[in-house]
A protein has these predicted regions:
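Amphipathic alpha-helical segments that form the core helices of the histone-fold
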Residues: 133-144
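Globin-like tetrapyrrole-binding proteins
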Residues: 162
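An acidic, gly/pro-interrupted, aromatic-rich
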Residues: 2-122, 126, 166-176
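Generic N-terminal initiation segments characterized by hydrophobic and/or small/turn-forming residues
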Residues: 80, 136, 156-157
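Basic, alpha-helical terminal appendages of large translation-related enzymes
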Residues: 133, 150, 157, 166, ...
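Short helix/loop segment immediately N-terminal to the Walker
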Residues: 145-152
């Protein structure tokens, strides 16, 4: 997701990253959030590890138990994973990063070009004819659902929804 949003910080080494924790974690065992957005764009291997407070996003996606060694990690596909990807503010922010890349690369009124660029950016391939048609139709329908007053904002809201959907596809999440 960080690569698709063009936000991955590839620096090696350095201090651990302390991402935002969801509300409701209290204050006793939490950590002070990293201030730099660049720090929050580093690989998950740099996320601060606290045995009694695993990072919730990683926990949902099979983070190993930090109390004992594990020779092999299980792979699961469970409903909370899909819910996190659909509802996480982090995933939505990364979708906004993808939208910015598309806006920087395409003319806003060229809808087919925006759909093609979304597919290339998120999935790494051109959309097939039916996918292109579906993407164009999706943008048209979503822009009418937006509560924004001006046409450009409605179009950008629809593009954000498309990018969010593409990030949630099996093709993006799983390597064949």
């Amino acid at each position: 997701m960080l690569v698709a949003a063009d936000q991955l910080d590839t620096r090696l080494y350095g201090p651990p990253v302390r991402p935002n924790l969801p509300p409701g974690f209290g204050t006793r065992y939490t950590w002070k959030t990293s201030k730099s957005t660049a720090d929050r764009s580093r690989r998950s291997i740099y996320i601060h590890a606290k045995r009694n407070l695993p990072y919730p996003l990683l926990r949902v996606f099979d983070q190993p138990d930090m109390h004992e060694s594990c020779a092999r990690r299980p792979q699961t596909t469970i409903a909370p994973q899909a819910l996190v990807l659909l509802n996480s503010e982090l995933v939505l922010d990364l979708s906004r990063g993808v939208v910015k890349r598309i806006q920087d690369a395409t003319y806003s009124k060229n809808i087919p070009a925006r759909v093609r660029h979304a597919w290339l950016t998120v999935l790494g391939r051109e959309p097939q004819k039916d996918e292109l048609a579906g993407g164009i139709q999706f943008l048209a329908e979503q822009s009418t659902r937006s509560e924004a007053k001006d046409e450009v904002t409605r179009a950008n809201d629809a593009l954000l929804d498309l990018c969010h959907v593409l990030i949630n596809t099996n093709e993006f999440l799983y390597i064949d």
